[in-house]
Amino acid sequence: MKRNQRKVLIGIVKSTKNAKTATVQVESRFKHPLYHKSVVRHKKYQAHNEGEVLAKDGDKVQIVETRPLSATKRFRIAKIIERAK
C-alpha cells in the first residue's frame, strides 16, 4: 500500500484500557439522498497507541491506516489534534 493512498481519519479517543491500544470513534456526516436530511454515523476503530504520541481518553486524534498489527488493529495514532480538557 502506497503512503499517499492510506486512509486518514479524525476522531475522539473513547477508551485506552487495552495495552498499547486506543478505541477511536470517528463521526461521518452525509445528506440522505431521498429525504435530504443530514445524517450522522459513528464507527469505532482500534488504533495503535504507543511511542511519542500517547493519547488519553477524550483527545481528538488523527489516525492513519497501516499494516495489520493484530486481529482488529489496522490504524495507528499519527498525531493529537486537541487534548481533552
From Swiss-Prot:
Keywords: Ribonucleoprotein, Ribosomal protein, RNA-binding, rRNA-binding. One of its GO terms (biological process) is translation. It holds the Pfam family Ribosomal_S17. InterPro entries: NA-bd_OB-fold (IPR012340), Ribosomal_uS17 (IPR000266), Ribosomal_uS17_bact/chlr (IPR019984), Ribosomal_uS17_CS (IPR019979). Part of the 30S ribosomal subunit. NCBIfam families: PRK05610.1, uS17_bact. One of the primary rRNA binding proteins, it binds specifically to the 5'-end of 16S ribosomal RNA. This is Small ribosomal subunit protein uS17. It comes from Mycoplasma pneumoniae (strain ATCC 29342 / M129 / Subtype 1).
